[in-house]
């Protein structure tokens, strides 16, 4: 059994929606990123890679590589799952915490869980996503961006 932790942050910029957990959410800003900016899937990918001692998404999908410009983070996550499986691991469960003042995440959580479960090849009850605010403190509280913490449990195949 292995446990990994992932963390990612993206700042708000131009746009009228964000993508989190593979779900498009209307918002007054977009997220600035080299890929599609799905901070939730980036943190989950890092947690999975960390648990398998395979580095991080920057190593596998560098933002200096034009192939990943605007990349679909769901495709990147599925690739991470394949890399982890090649090393003899399968996902036991994942848990993520979205830290954001806005937009409200509650209406989208179940859809995120389903999308993530599909990409991980696991049941929805092996995926947990929750959200919190920082009571208007820090960069997330000032609505400058979004952060996500994620943990993943891997089990031998």
Curated annotation (Swiss-Prot):
<feature type="binding site">
    <location>
        <position position="10"/>
    </location>
    <ligand>
        <name>a divalent metal cation</name>
    </ligand>
</feature>
<feature type="binding site">
    <location>
        <begin position="61"/>
        <end position="65"/>
    </location>
    <ligand>
        <name>4-CDP-2-C-methyl-D-erythritol 2-phosphate</name>
    </ligand>
</feature>
<feature type="binding site">
    <location>
        <position position="142"/>
    </location>
    <ligand>
        <name>4-CDP-2-C-methyl-D-erythritol 2-phosphate</name>
    </ligand>
</feature>
<dbReference type="GO" id="GO:0046872">
    <property type="term" value="F:metal ion binding"/>
</dbReference>
<feature type="binding site">
    <location>
        <position position="42"/>
    </location>
    <ligand>
        <name>a divalent metal cation</name>
    </ligand>
</feature>
<feature type="site" description="Transition state stabilizer">
    <location>
        <position position="34"/>
    </location>
</feature>
<feature type="binding site">
    <location>
        <position position="139"/>
    </location>
    <ligand>
        <name>4-CDP-2-C-methyl-D-erythritol 2-phosphate</name>
    </ligand>
</feature>
<keyword id="KW-0414">Isoprene biosynthesis</keyword>
<feature type="binding site">
    <location>
        <begin position="100"/>
        <end position="106"/>
    </location>
    <ligand>
        <name>4-CDP-2-C-methyl-D-erythritol 2-phosphate</name>
    </ligand>
</feature>
<feature type="binding site">
    <location>
        <position position="8"/>
    </location>
    <ligand>
        <name>a divalent metal cation</name>
    </ligand>
</feature>
<dbReference type="InterPro" id="IPR036571">
    <property type="entry name" value="MECDP_synthase_sf"/>
</dbReference>
<dbReference type="GO" id="GO:0008685">
    <property type="term" value="F:2-C-methyl-D-erythritol 2,4-cyclodiphosphate synthase activity"/>
</dbReference>
<comment type="pathway">
    <text>Isoprenoid biosynthesis; isopentenyl diphosphate biosynthesis via DXP pathway; isopentenyl diphosphate from 1-deoxy-D-xylulose 5-phosphate: step 4/6.</text>
</comment>
<dbReference type="InterPro" id="IPR020555">
    <property type="entry name" value="MECDP_synthase_CS"/>
</dbReference>
<dbReference type="GO" id="GO:0016114">
    <property type="term" value="P:terpenoid biosynthetic process"/>
</dbReference>
<dbReference type="Pfam" id="PF02542">
    <property type="entry name" value="YgbB"/>
</dbReference>
<feature type="binding site">
    <location>
        <begin position="8"/>
        <end position="10"/>
    </location>
    <ligand>
        <name>4-CDP-2-C-methyl-D-erythritol 2-phosphate</name>
    </ligand>
</feature>
<protein>
    <recommendedName>
        <fullName>2-C-methyl-D-erythritol 2,4-cyclodiphosphate synthase</fullName>
        <ecNumber>4.6.1.12</ecNumber>
    </recommendedName>
</protein>
<feature type="binding site">
    <location>
        <begin position="56"/>
        <end position="58"/>
    </location>
    <ligand>
        <name>4-CDP-2-C-methyl-D-erythritol 2-phosphate</name>
    </ligand>
</feature>
<feature type="site" description="Transition state stabilizer">
    <location>
        <position position="133"/>
    </location>
</feature>
<keyword id="KW-0456">Lyase</keyword>
<feature type="binding site">
    <location>
        <begin position="132"/>
        <end position="135"/>
    </location>
    <ligand>
        <name>4-CDP-2-C-methyl-D-erythritol 2-phosphate</name>
    </ligand>
</feature>
<keyword id="KW-0479">Metal-binding</keyword>
<comment type="subunit">
    <text>Homotrimer.</text>
</comment>
<comment type="function">
    <text>Involved in the biosynthesis of isopentenyl diphosphate (IPP) and dimethylallyl diphosphate (DMAPP), two major building blocks of isoprenoid compounds. Catalyzes the conversion of 4-diphosphocytidyl-2-C-methyl-D-erythritol 2-phosphate (CDP-ME2P) to 2-C-methyl-D-erythritol 2,4-cyclodiphosphate (ME-CPP) with a corresponding release of cytidine 5-monophosphate (CMP).</text>
</comment>
<dbReference type="InterPro" id="IPR003526">
    <property type="entry name" value="MECDP_synthase"/>
</dbReference>
<dbReference type="GO" id="GO:0019288">
    <property type="term" value="P:isopentenyl diphosphate biosynthetic process, methylerythritol 4-phosphate pathway"/>
</dbReference>
<comment type="similarity">
    <text>Belongs to the IspF family.</text>
</comment>
<feature type="binding site">
    <location>
        <begin position="34"/>
        <end position="35"/>
    </location>
    <ligand>
        <name>4-CDP-2-C-methyl-D-erythritol 2-phosphate</name>
    </ligand>
</feature>
């Amino acid at each position: 059994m292995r446990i990994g932790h992932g963390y990612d942050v993206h700042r708000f910029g131009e746009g009228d929606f964000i993508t989190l957990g593979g779900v498009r959410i209307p918002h007054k800003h977009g997220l600035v990123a080299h890929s599609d900016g799905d901070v939730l899937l980036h943190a989950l990918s890092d947690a999975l890679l960390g648990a398998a001692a395979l580095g991080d998404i920057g190593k596998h999908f560098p933002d200096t590589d034009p192939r990943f410009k605007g990349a679909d983070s769901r495709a990147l996550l599925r690739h991470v799952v394949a890399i982890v499986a090649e090393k003899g691991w399968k996902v036991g469960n994942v848990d993520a915490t979205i830290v954001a003042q806005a937009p409200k995440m509650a209406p989208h959580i179940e859809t995120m869980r389903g999308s993530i479960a599909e990409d991980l090849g696991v049941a929805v009850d092996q995926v947990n996503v929750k959200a919190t605010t920082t009571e208007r403190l820090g960069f997330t509280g000032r609505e400058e961006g979004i952060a996500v913490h994620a943990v993943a449990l891997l089990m031998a195949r």
